[in-house]
A protein has these predicted regions:
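Active-site-proximal binding-pocket segments
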Residues: 13-16, 20, 52-64, 70-128
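Basic, alpha-helical terminal appendages of large translation-related enzymes
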Residues: 23, 87, 92-93, 102-213
């Protein structure tokens, strides 16, 4: 019943795969995974990075200036997170791997929250350029790391970045996008699923169960 949300269903199933504890799919969990993780974490970060770049730098990747300690720390985390996801995949630990994907998105969200480029723009636009350059490099890495789990969303990220799909060999790089590169048209990566939609699915499930009794 969600033909337009194959990645959401895929993500919900992957995060519920039994590895060290039993679990099962529920529509409420499907909604929660979408709204609280895909929308609030992954989609939110990608959207903020792209919208801020569009607003402050005419939708072009800004040049990177000198890096401050907070930038260096984010760059170091960016270098190691994709390899952790790859290691989890090699060990068939898919729930752990999807958690690693979200950790990369959380890194981006935290970096923007800590650097607050919207507060720095008027006083130091060059600094904002450096912040958004690094944020966009994280977005580009999400386009790589998300591909095994969320192939349609990964393709959408690359489309919004106007970037040719990259390979895992490039994952962890902070030089996937050059300064001056023109980005594509941004949009919401995921949309919130309202309670009424889930309630309809639960009612359908209830009717099917009754018909089988």
């Amino acid at each position: 019943d969600f033909p337009d949300k194959p990645d959401v269903l895929r993500y919900s199933l992957l995060t519920n795969l039994p590895e060290t504890k039993d679990s099962e799919f529920t529509w409420k969990d499907f909604q929660s995974r979408n709204n609280n993780e895909l929308v609030a974490i992954l989609g939110n970060f990608v959207n903020r990075a792209l919208v801020l770049t569009q607003k402050y730098f005419d939708n072009k990747v800004p040049a990177r200036g000198s890096l401050e300690p907070i930038d260096l720390a984010a760059r170091e985390s960016l270098k190691v997170l994709p390899s952790r996801v790859a290691q989890s995949l090699e060990q068939y630990r898919f729930r752990e791997a999807t958690a690693g994907l979200m950790d990369l998105a959380r890194l981006g969200n935290k970096y923007l929250a800590d650097t607050e480029p919207w507060k720095v723009q008027k006083s130091n636009p060059e600094r904002v350029g450096t912040i958004l350059n690094l944020a966009l490099q994280i977005v580009a890495n999400l386009g790589i790391v998300a591909e095994p789990f969320l192939p349609f969303s990964a393709a959408r990220i690359n489309e919004m970045l106007n970037l040719t799909p990259q390979t895992w060999l490039q994952a962890g790089s902070d030089e996937l996008l050059e300064g001056g590169h023109a980005l594509g048209i941004s949009g919401l990566l995921f949309e919130k699923i309202e309670d009424v939609v889930i309630e309809q699915q639960l009612q359908k499930l209830h009717k099917k169960k009754k018909s089988m009794d």
